[in-house]
A protein has these predicted regions:
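Intrinsically disordered, low-complexity regulatory segments of kinases
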Residues: 1-112
Length: 112
């Protein structure tokens, strides 16, 4: 028997969240307002990331463009058939949730 998960209501619009602390309707608005603030330099990649952000139902589905200057502890791993592979830590960290008070994304970085 399948029992659907019930999430709390969004603090912003008061509708039921689509994921844990995730309101698709409100986050679509927040992502769209931020489109002008970043670019990969490639329109196709930008569109792919933007489409992903608009269709995500919870934070684990969200892709973001990370500029090189937002990475640290960059470490070369190996060379493959299509390029070199590196790993790094992200200064800002991934999106945790929308902070209604500060009107910005609350983020979680690699160190904490």
């Amino acid at each position: 028997m399948y029992i659907p998960l019930k999430y709390k209501n969004c603090r912003e619009c008061k509708q039921e969240n689509t994921g844990m602390l995730y309101c698709k309707a409100c986050n679509v608005k927040h992502f769209q307002q931020n489109f002008k603030n970043w670019t990969s330099g490639n329109n196709d990649i930008d569109k792919f990331i933007q489409d992903n952000q608009l269709s995500a139902n919870f934070y684990g589905q969200v892709l973001e463009w990370i500029p090189y200057n937002k990475l640290y502890d960059i470490e070369y791993i190996a060379k493959g058939g299509f390029g070199k592979v590196y790993r790094a830590k992200w200064i800002d960290g991934f999106i945790g949730y929308w902070d209604n008070i500060n009107e910005n994304w609350e983020r979680h970085n690699s160190d904490g």
